[in-house]
Amino acid sequence: MVFIADYGAGNLRSVQKAFDYLGIPATVSSDPAKMAGCRKVVLPGVGAFGQAIEALDRLGFTDALSEHVDKGGHLFGICLGMQLMLSDSEEMGSHRGLGLIPGSVRHFQSDSDKIPQIGWNSIDLKQESVLFRGIADHSFFYFVHSYYCDPLEASSIASTTWFAGKNFCSAIEKNGIFAVQFHPEKSSEAGLQVLRNFAEC
């Protein structure tokens, strides 16, 4: 069973429908206690970083997610969910993150590319990856974001993507923590394969 954390931040129902389409049981809940017994947890999200981390704190997910990872469970962040895993964010001020991956969330700066990035873009794989097993390098995925993750440890970066004059980190994979900046549930067959790979790893 895949547990999808409901903390009031967007795209969780579309993520659940994608798992349903794949025939993978998935449940949505705002109660961290119901994570017990679920080895796979998904942290989706669309919205503002500060409001999201406050909601995670209020609902008790902040400690529960850390405990889940510490016990060997797998955690998968999508879009804002990926950003929340880092140490801090500069989105509309300065905010503490979950601190599961050392690094910061930064705003794109560009005179040439329109921000936010909205649409399809390709990934460049940086390591042998569980998430991207069976997916060709340079495959395209669907992005919607104005901020990007800047991890301190290069070893945690699973893929990068070129936008706004930089190769930013578009996927993370390390010690049972997985995350993607794009929306796999909106990324056709390649995106569905990412979800399948997470559920089956």
Curated annotation (Swiss-Prot):
Its EC number is 4.3.2.10, 3.5.1.2. IGPS catalyzes the conversion of PRFAR and glutamine to IGP, AICAR and glutamate. The HisH subunit catalyzes the hydrolysis of glutamine to glutamate and ammonia as part of the synthesis of IGP and AICAR. The resulting ammonia molecule is channeled to the active site of HisF. One of its GO terms (biological process) is L-histidine biosynthetic process. It comes from the Bacteria. This is Imidazole glycerol phosphate synthase subunit HisH. It comes from Chlorobium luteolum (strain DSM 273 / BCRC 81028 / 2530). It catalyses: 5-[(5-phospho-1-deoxy-D-ribulos-1-ylimino)methylamino]-1-(5-phospho-beta-D-ribosyl)imidazole-4-carboxamide + L-glutamine = D-erythro-1-(imidazol-4-yl)glycerol 3-phosphate + 5-amino-1-(5-phospho-beta-D-ribosyl)imidazole-4-carboxamide + L-glutamate + H(+); L-glutamine + H2O = L-glutamate + NH4(+). Gene3D superfamilies: 3.40.50.880. The active site is at 79 (nucleophile), 183, 185. The keyword Amino-acid biosynthesis applies. Pathway: Amino-acid biosynthesis; L-histidine biosynthesis; L-histidine from 5-phospho-alpha-D-ribose 1-diphosphate: step 5/9. InterPro entries: Class_I_gatase-like, GATASE, Imidazole-glycPsynth_HisH. Heterodimer of HisH and HisF.
